[in-house]
Amino acid sequence: MTRRDFAKLTTAAVVIPAFAAIESKFSGVMIGAQTYSFRTLPSLDACVAAMQEIGLGYAELWDGQILPKDRSQVAAWRTNPPMDEIRGIRKKFDDAGIDLYAFNYSFRDEFTDEQIEQGFLMAKALGVTRITASSNVDVSPRVDKFAEQYKIYVGYHNHDSMKPNEFSTPDDWKRALDGRSKYTGINLDIGHFTAANFDPVSFLEEHHAKIVTLHIKDRKKDHGPNMPLGQGDTNIKGVLEVLKTRKYPIPAMIEYEYGMPGMDTVAEVKKCLGYCKAALS
C-alpha cells in the first residue's frame, strides 16, 4: 500500500477486508499496539487500517477512541454505553485480522459501582478477557469484586507521577494486589517504570505471573522525556529477551508517545515495530 493509498483510506475511514490473521509474533513474542498510539488519526477505522498497514496483529483498545467527543457526556455514557456499537468494534478488528486482546478502561475513585461494572460489561461486549486501567490505587478493592464476578483480568497501568494514590512504584501494585483475587494484576509500562528509576527486567522476571500486558516505550531516567525506541534509558531489548527466552505469554504493546506535531504516526510506529523485531532477531 502506498502512502497516497493510505491517505485515501484514512480519509474515507474504510477498513481493508482481511481473510487471515495478521502475524506479528516474532521469536515467539507477541508484538501489538495500544491504540492510543494512533490518537492523531481521524477515526477508529483509520487506526485499524494503520495497524493493518504496519502489520500489527494484537491490539489494546484505548477507550478514548470510543468515548463521546463532548466531555460533558462522558459520565452518562459510562453509565449507559451503546453496547451494540461496542460489539461492532470487535468486528472491525476481526475483519482486519487483528486480535483485540485487551480493553483500556481506567477506573477512578469518583466512578460509581455502576460505572465500574459497565467497564466489565463493555469488555464482554468486545469479547476480551483483559482490561488495562490507569486507575487510583484506592479503587482496586471495588474493581476486584467485579473482576472476580466477570472473570476478567485487570492490569493496573503505571506512570511516574509518584503520587500516593497513583500507580508508580512496586509498592503501589503490592497495595492493590494484596488480598485480592487472581483477576487483579499489572499492566507494566516499561518506559514509565524506567523514568521512575525502577528496573523493568527484574520486575518482569519476579512478577510475570501477574502481568496482563506490557507497554513498550522508551524514556530517560529521573522522570525524563519520551524518546524514540533505543534512544532512552529503558532496557527494551532486555525485556523482549526475557519474553523470548522464558516464553512468557505476555503481549508487548507498542505505545507511541514521543511524537511531535508534524510527525507521521504510521511511519513512527513502523519504526517502533522494526526496533522490536530487530531486538528479537
Region locations from a protein language model:
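Glycine-rich, proline-tolerant flexible connector loops at the mouths of alpha/beta enzymes
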Residues: 61-87
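Residue-level recognition of beta-strand->loop/alpha-helix junctions
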Residues: 37, 62-63, 104, 158
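Flexible loop residues that form catalytic
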Residues: 64, 108, 136, 219, ...
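Short beta-strand segments at enzyme active-site cores
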Residues: 59-63, 100-103, 132-133, 251-254
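Active-site acidic/histidine proton-transfer and metal-coordination neighborhood
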Residues: 10-12, 16-23, 86, 92, ...
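Histidine-acidic metal/acid-base catalytic patches
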Residues: 4-32, 39-58, 167-170, 174-188, ...
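Active-site mouth loops of central-metabolism enzymes
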Residues: 32-42, 103-112
